[in-house]
A protein has these predicted regions:
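A two-mode feature
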Residues: 278-282, 290, 297
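Charged/polar low-complexity intrinsically disordered segments
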Residues: 14-16
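Active/binding-pocket-proximal capping segment
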Residues: 271-279
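Short Cys/His-rich Zn2+-coordinating modules
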Residues: 286
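Early transmembrane hairpin module of multi-pass membrane proteins
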Residues: 21, 26-263, 267-269, 291-299, ...
Length: 360
C-alpha cells in the first residue's frame, strides 16, 4: 500500500516536471521566434490591431452612413464594412509581400555589402512601404472616405520614394542616419501637403493647361508621384547602361509619354523637362555604379507594372469593360499585378554586389 502511494506521488511529480519543461520550452520557443522574427511578429500584431479598429469604427460610421468619397473604380458599392469587396481584398497582396520580406530578414545583425541582405532599416522600410500601400488602399476602397483616400496616396508616395532615396544613399554613400532624416522629412512634408490639399480645394493656377487648372492636390498626386517613378527609371537606366545619357533621358521620357493616363499636356512637358535635368545632373555627378542583376527580376517587376497600368485603364467607372456587379474587377487585377511587381523589385535589390566608383 505504501509502495503504491509512493509510486503515485513519484508519477505525479514526474508529470509535473514534464509539464513545466514543456511550458518552459514553449516559452523559450516563442521567445526565440520573437527575437529572430521580431519585425514580422510586431507587424502581425499591428495588422490585427488595425483590423480590430477598422471593424469597431466602421460599424458605427461608413458601414451605416452614405459614402463620402467615391473611388470611381467600377465596382458596385456594397453595404457593410467593406464597400468595394474585390477592390479592397485584393490589396492583401501588398500586405503579403511586405510580410514575406520581413519573414526573410536574417536572424542575426551581421553586416553585408548589400544592405538589403541585412536585418537593417532598408528591407524593413521596403516591407513597411508595401504593407502601407495595402493598408492605405484597403482603407480607400473599403471605406470610401476622404481619410481613406489620403491613406492610399500617402502609402503610395511612401513606397515609391524609397527606391529613389535608397539608390541615392548607395550612389553617394549616405550614412543610415542621413538617409532616414532625408526620407522621413520629405515624406512627412509630402503627407501633410497631400492631406491638406485633399481637404481643401485650392487652385494654384487657373487654365494652366488649356482649360484645366493646376490644383494643390496635383503637386503630390500627379507631379511628385510621376517624378519619383521617372527618377527611379533614370537611376536604373544609369546603372544598367553604364551611365549612358541617351538611355537615362530616353527611358523616362518614353515611360512618361506612353504610360500617362489623361494627363494635361503641360504636365507631360514639365515632367519631361525635369527628367532631362535630373538625368544630366546624375550623369555628370555619377557617384558609385550600383552592380545589380536585372535579369529576370527587374524585367518581371516592370512587366507586371506595365501590364497592370494597361489593366488599370479598363477598371475605371464608365469604361466599356466595366461591370460593377462582377466579381472580376480590373482594378483588383491592378492591385495583384503591382503587388507582384513589388516582390520582384525586392528580389532585384537583393542582387546588388560591391559598388564601383564611376569615372568620367
Amino acid at each position: 500500500m505504501t509502495s503504491a502511494c509512493g509510486d503515485n506521488v513519484l508519477f505525479n511529480t514526474q508529470n509535473e516536471i514534464l509539464l513545466r519543461c514543456r511550458r518552459a520550452m514553449t516559452k523559450q520557443s516563442f521567445s526565440t521566434l520573437f527575437e529572430q522574427k521580431r519585425e514580422f511578429v510586431v507587424s502581425i500584431g499591428i495588422l490585427v490591431l488595425l483590423a480590430t479598429m477598422y471593424a469597431i469604427l466602421g460599424a458605427s460610421t461608413w458601414a451605416v452612413e452614405p459614402i463620402e468619397s467615391a473611388t470611381n473604380f467600377c465596382e458596385g458599392i456594397s453595404d457593410g464594412l467593406i464597400k468595394e469587396p474585390m477592390n479592397t481584398l485584393s490589396n492583401l497582396t501588398y500586405v503579403f509581400v511586405g510580410l514575406v520580406v520581413l519573414w526573410n530578414l536574417p536572424t542575426t545583425r551581421e553586416k553585408s555589402r548589400n544592405p538589403m541582405l541585412e536585418r537593417s532599416v532598408y528591407p524593413i522600410l521596403f516591407a513597411t512601404g508595401s504593407i502601407y500601400i495595402g493598408v492605405g488602399s484597403f482603407a480607400m476602397h473599403g471605406t470610401n472616405t476622404n481619410w481613406g483616400t489620403s491613406m492610399d496616396w500617402t502609402g503610395m508616395l511612401f513606397f515609391i520614394s524609397f527606391p529613389v532615396y535608397y539608390n541615392l544613399s548607395r550612389q553617394y554613400r549616405w550614412s543610415d542616419r542621413f538617409f532616414l532624416t532625408v526620407f522621413f522629412c520629405v515624406f512627412v512634408l509630402t503627407a501633410l501637403l497631400d492631406t491638406f490639399a485633399a481637404n481643401n480645394n485650392v487652385t494654384l493656377i487657373e487654365n494652366f493647361s488649356g482649360t484645366r487648372n493646376l490644383k494643390l492636390s496635383s503637386i503630390t498626386r500627379d507631379y511628385l508621384w510621376s517624378l519619383y517613378i521617372g527618377v527611379w527609371l533614370i537611376q536604373e537606366a544609369k546603372n544598367l547602361s553604364g551611365n549612358q545619357l541617351s538611355w537615362m533621358i530616353g527611358v523616362p521620357l518614353v515611360a512618361c509619354i506612353t504610360l500617362s493616363v489623361g494627363a494635361p499636356t503641360m504636365q507631360i512637358i514639365l515632367l519631361c523637362l525635369m527628367f532631362i535635368g535630373i538625368a544630366l545632373a546624375l550623369h555628370f555627378n555619377p557617384g558609385q555604379t550600383l552592380l545589380r542583376k536585372a535579369q529576370p527580376d527587374l524585367w518581371i517587376g516592370f512587366g507586371c507594372y506595365i501590364v497592370g497600368n494597361i489593366v488599370w485603364r479598363y477598371g475605371r467607372s464608365g469604361e466599356a469593360a466595366c461591370n460593377p456587379d462582377s466579381l472580376f474587377q480590373y482594378h483588383a487585377v491592378w492591385h495583384i499585378l503591382t503587388g507582384a511587381s513589388l516582390y520582384f523589385f525586392y528580389r532585384y535589390f537583393r542582387t546588388e554586389t560591391k559598388p564601383e566608383s564611376s569615372e568620367l
